[in-house]
Swiss-Prot record:
GO biological-process terms attached to the record: proteolysis
Record protein name field: Myofibril-bound serine protease
EC main group: hydrolase
pH dependence: Optimum pH is 8.0. Active from pH 5.0 to at least 9.0.
EC number: 3.4.21.-
GO molecular function, a single term: serine-type peptidase activity
GO CC terms, sorted: cytoplasm
Similarity comment text for this entry: Belongs to the peptidase S1 family.
Temperature dependence (free text): Optimum temperature is 55 degrees Celsius.
Tissue: Detected in muscle (at protein level).
Functional note: Serine protease that selectively cleaves Arg-|-Xaa bonds.
Keywords: Cytoplasm, Hydrolase, Protease, Serine protease
C-alpha cells in the first residue's frame, strides 16, 4: 500500500481506494 492512511478524511479518491485495498 502506498502511504499509510487509516480511516482518515481522504481528500483524493485514489487515497480512499488505496486504504480500502489494504
Amino acid at each position: 500500500i502506498i502511504g499509510g492512511y487509516e480511516c482518515k478524511p481522504h481528500s483524493q479518491p485514489w487515497q480512499a481506494f488505496l486504504v480500502d485495498n489494504k
